[in-house]
């Protein structure tokens, strides 16, 4: 019997988005899962760290970052990275890669940028393609498409092509927000993840600062009306057939589900969420419908709001490269659905190869 050749996984992480550190944490989890006893029989992993300058770092240094031998925050570019940089277009480091596993959260990664680059290698990758990634990252475009499909969402207002350096423009926008939406509102950059750049605003006086904070990340801004809701999440994997995980709920100790709540706090996670079976079915159906509409496949996490007073479902957003950190919901959802992290990463590779 001929032994099957191991697949070489090209694990890409880091990047120069503001979610750089989250990407490293996710990559550590995935790297360890591929190097488990069961997966070592099927896979080899080559790691490629992209530092905050945009340099690609070779496998030796990248692995040392993942296993903790090098602290990336304390490493100066001139002292180490200049000697270990690689040129993506040369292709030497990438010749033996069978499949890519990009874990770049945020812009220049999750937005489809890395997917477009990797397409030139003519190798499959874990996750969805350029279009689905770009639409999933852009909150405004995503919500516009969902509105056209009559998928329920909270009331929102779009701000784009406005000069927020102009005081008159800012005052006009504040008046428009107050006129169209009820407080509290959430002010969000259109292209950002992990709740970075987002502010909860409870009155007029705080709107200006929130708009400026979002504008620092993206000139296109989304303002959403805040409701009393539960945070509900659903995992998706698959290609032609999309499978849904158990439904999970996050109860956070802070005022809202901000960056610190996602990664630094002790939130209460309930999987499966304690909700009616009919509502669970509707959430899963909307999750599949929304992913199909945006051409999202491979894997994703779909986030919902469930209004406390009415049990009305609102689609929030789709995350096309959800976190794999120790506090991330996506791997927890699938573990509760029968796939531990070692099985999950292997399954994602199989899906991308259509096995």
From Swiss-Prot:
EC number: 6.3.2.4
Residues involved in Mg(2+) 1 binding: 303, 317
Pathway: Cell wall biogenesis; peptidoglycan biosynthesis
Cell location: Cytoplasm
One protein family per Pfam: Dala_Dala_lig_C
Cofactors named for this entry: Mg(2+); Mn(2+)
InterPro entries: ATP-grasp, ATP_grasp_subdomain_1, D-Ala_lig_Van_CS, D_ala_D_ala, Dala_Dala_lig_C, Dala_Dala_lig_N, PreATP-grasp_dom_sf
Protein name: D-alanine--D-alanine ligase
Source organism per UniProt: Prochlorococcus marinus (strain MIT 9312)
């Amino acid at each position: 019997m001929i032994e099957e050749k191991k697949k070489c996984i090209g694990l890409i992480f880091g990047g120069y988005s503001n979610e750089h550190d989250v990407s490293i944490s996710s990559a550590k989890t995935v790297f360890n899962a591929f190097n488990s006893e069961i997966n070592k029989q099927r896979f080899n992993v080559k790691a490629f760290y992209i530092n905050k300058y945009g340099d690609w770092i070779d496998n030796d240094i990248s692995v040392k970052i993942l296993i903790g031998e090098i602290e990336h925050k304390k490493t100066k570019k001139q002292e180490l990275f200049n000697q270990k940089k690689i040129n993506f277009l040369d292709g030497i480091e990438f010749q033996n890669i069978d499949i890519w596993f990009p874990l770049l959260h945020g812009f220049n990664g999750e937005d489809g940028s890395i997917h477009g680059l990797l397409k030139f290698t003519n190798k499959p990758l874990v996750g969805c393609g350029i279009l689905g990634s770009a639409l999933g990252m852009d909150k405004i475009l995503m919500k516009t498409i969902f509105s056209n499909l009559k998928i329920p969402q909270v009331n929102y207002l779009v701000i784009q092509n406005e000069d927020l350096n102009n005081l008159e423009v800012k005052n006009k926008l504040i008046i428009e927000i107050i006129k169209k939406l009820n407080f509290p509102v959430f002010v969000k950059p259109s292209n950002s993840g992990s709740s970075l750049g987002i502010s909860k605003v409870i009155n007029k006086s705080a709107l200006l600062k929130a708009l400026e904070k979002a504008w620092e990340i993206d000139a296109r801004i989304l303002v959403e009306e805040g409701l009393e809701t539960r945070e509900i999440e659903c995992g998706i994997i698959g290609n032609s057939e999309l499978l849904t995980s158990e439904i999970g709920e996050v109860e956070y100790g802070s005022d809202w589900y901000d960056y610190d709540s996602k990664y630094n706090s002790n939130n209460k996670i309930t999987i499966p969420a304690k909700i009616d079976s009919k509502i669970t079915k509707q959430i899963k159906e909307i999750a599949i419908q929304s992913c199909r509409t945006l051409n999202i496949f491979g894997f994703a996490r779909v986030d919902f709001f469930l209004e406390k007073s009415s049990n009305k479902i609102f689609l929030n957003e789709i995350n096309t490269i959800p976190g794999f950190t120790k506090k991330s919901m996506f791997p927890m959802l699938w573990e509760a659905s029968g796939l531990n992290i070692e099985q999950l990463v292997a399954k994602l590779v199989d899906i991308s190869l259509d096995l």
